[in-house]
């Protein structure tokens, strides 16, 4: 894939899927900008990516900061929003403020980023959002996450129609992936979680971040794809 001369902005690019995407995009010759909340992780990520990479802290829930950041650039070709969070618990027990926080992070955050980026995006560019396998195959104790993932997919399809002729809009729906997002879960609980998920999948394991990042590269490069929800879930959607 050739991305020489293209400016790719990756939100959540300091770790996991976002970092692996940044590595692949840089190898393809793109000018890379990674954004995330923690400056220390950004600094380390920039070393891993190598070459010329812009790494700047940004909280996508801060509307003024997001607007100010995008106002500083002349042009963006591709926007990838991998930053996300999760929430699990019984429907009747999960505090509503946590549900609201999840909605603000996983839906309103990307929504805000796309609105701010659009005036700077070159015609023919693309946007890649992230949902999750729970959007169409919900599990118990994940009502909020399942619903919000579905909302991201609906947003993807709506924007693909509304922004047709300007930019393409697609979405990755990944299955469980071995990323730092789960580092807060203590061992052996984390390993058990991966093992339990693996047993339900035809491929017999959870994903590695690079495998999801390769799907992002497909969406960036295939000019005939828009409004697509790309399942990279190890077969969860058919299991």
State what each model feature region is.
Residues 14-16:
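Conserved glycine-rich cofactor-binding loop
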Residues 48-64:
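Rossmann-fold cofactor-recognition segment
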Residues 82-89, 234-235:
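Conserved NAD(P)H cofactor-binding loop of Rossmann-fold oxidoreductase domains
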Residues 90-91, 98-103, 193, 197:
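Substrate-binding pocket helix/loop in short-chain dehydrogenase/reductase
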Residues 102-103, 107, 111-112, 126-164, ...:
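Catalytic loop of short-chain dehydrogenase/reductase
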Residues 153, 163-177, 225-232:
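Conserved Rossmann-fold SDR core element
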Residues 190-211:
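Catalytic Tyr-x(3-8)-Lys segment
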């Amino acid at each position: 894939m050739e991305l020489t001369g293209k400016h790719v902005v990756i939100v959540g690019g300091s770790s996991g899927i976002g970092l692996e995407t940044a590595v692949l995009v840089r190898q393809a010759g793109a000018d890379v900008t990674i954004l995330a909340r923690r400056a220390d992780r950004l600094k380390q990520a920039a070393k891993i990516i190598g070459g010329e990479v812009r790494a700047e802290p940004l909280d996508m829930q801060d509307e003024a900061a997001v607007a100010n950041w995008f106002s500083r650039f002349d042009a963006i070709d591709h926007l990838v929003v991998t930053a996300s969070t999760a929430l699990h618990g019984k429907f009747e027990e999960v505090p509503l403020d946590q549900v609201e926080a999840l909605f603000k992070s996983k839906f309103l955050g990307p929504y805000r980023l796309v609105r701010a980026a659009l005036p700077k995006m070159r015609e023919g560019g693309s946007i890649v959002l992230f949902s999750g396998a729970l959007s169409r195959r919900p599990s118990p104790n994940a009502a909020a996450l399942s619903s919000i993932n579905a909302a991201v997919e609906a947003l993807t399809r709506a924007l693909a129609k509304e922004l047709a002729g300007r930019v393409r809009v697609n979405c990755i729906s990944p299955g469980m992936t071995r990323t730092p997002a789960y580092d807060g879960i203590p061992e052996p609980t984390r390993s058990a979680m991966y093992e339990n998920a693996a047993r339900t999948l035809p491929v017999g394991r959870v994903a590695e971040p690079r495998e999801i990042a390769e799907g992002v590269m497909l969406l960036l490069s295939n000019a005939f794809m828009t409004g697509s929800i790309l399942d990279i879930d190890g077969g969860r959607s058919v299991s």
